[in-house]
Regions:
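Substrate-binding pocket helix/loop in short-chain dehydrogenase/reductase
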Residues: 22-23, 30-35
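Residue(s) in the substrate-gating loop at a strand-loop-helix junction
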Residues: 66
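C-terminal helical subdomain
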Residues: 124-216
Length: 219
C-alpha cells in the first residue's frame, strides 16, 4: 500500500458487519465472523500502518466502537464484544504510540446506515445523517487531536465517554469475604469518587498504596 500511495499518516478503521441473534441462538461461526471483521480487521489495518507512523514520528488513528459494546444491546453479543475490544486496543496503542506522536482515539457513531435502517423509525433516521459524524472523526484525526479519547457522535450531538473506577476501599484480611463486600458495597460503588485511570499500572499502584496505608508500610 505504501509503495503505491506513499506514507499514510491518518487511519480510520471502520469496517464492520452484523450477524445479530440472541445468545441462545448464536452459533460459534456467527461470533467468530463478526470479531474477525471488526476487531481483527482493525488490528490488521493498524498493524500495516504502525511502523511507518513510528518511523515518521507522526500518526493519527481512529478506531470505531459502538454503544452496543459500551453499554450493551440485546442480540449483539458478537458485535458488542468486538466493539468493546476496540477500547482495549485503543488504550494500548495510545500508550505505545505516545513517544512517537501517534495519537489513537475511538469514535462511537450513531447514524442512519444500512445497519440501522430497520431498527429505528423514519423520523429518527432523518435526524441521524452520517455527515453528523464527520466533524468528530476529522477532529480526532487532526494535528491537535487528543489521544485515548472515546467520542460519541450522532445527529449533531457530541460527547466524551470514559471508563472510570471508584476510589473504593481497602479491607483488612479478616474481612476478605463476600459478606464484607456486600456490607460495604454502597461505599465501594460510590461514583462520586470515580476517576479515569491513565494506564493499568495506575490501578495497581492505587491498590498497593491503599494496602500499604492500612498496614502502615512505607513504600
Amino acid at each position: 500500500m505504501t509503495k503505491e500511495w506513499g506514507a499514510v499518516d491518518l487511519l480510520c478503521a471502520n469496517a464492520g458487519i452484523l450477524r445479530d441473534k440472541s445468545f441462545a441462538k448464536m452459533e460459534v461461526a456467527d461470533f467468530a465472523k463478526v470479531l474477525d471483521v471488526h476487531l481483527n480487521g482493525t488490528f490488521y489495518c493498524c498493524k500495516a500502518m504502525w511502523n511507518g507512523m513510528r518511523e515518521r514520528n507522526y500518526g493519527r488513528i481512529v478506531v470505531t466502537t459502538s454503544s452496543s459494546g459500551l453499554f450493551g444491546n440485546f442480540g449483539q453479543a458478537n458485535y458488542g464484544a468486538a466493539k468493546a475490544g476496540m477500547i482495549g486496543l485503543m488504550n494500548v496503542l495510545a500508550e505505545e504510540g505516545r513517544k512517537n506522536n501517534i495519537r489513537v482515539n475511538t469514535i462511537s457513531p450513531t447514524a442512519a446506515t444500512r445497519m440501522t435502517e430497520e431498527l429505528l423509525p423514519p423520523q429518527a433516521l432523518a435526524l441521524m445523517k452520517p455527515e453528523s459524524i464527520t466533524p468528530a472523526v476529522l477532529y480526532l484525526l487532526g494535528e491537535d487531536a487528543p489521544t485515548r479519547t472515546i467520542m460519541g457522535a450522532g445527529a449533531g450531538s457530541f460527547a466524551v465517554i470514559k471508563v472510570v473506577e471508584t476510589e473504593g476501599i481497602n479491607l483488612p484480611s479478616v474481612d476478605w469475604t463476600p459478606e464484607a463486600i456486600a456490607a460495604h458495597f454502597a461505599e465501594i460503588s460510590d461514583m462520586s469518587t470515580a476517576k479515569a485511570l491513565e494506564n493499568a499500572f495506575q490501578q495497581t499502584n492505587k491498590y498497593v498504596s491503599q494496602a500499604a496505608a492500612r498496614a502502615g508500610v512505607k513504600l
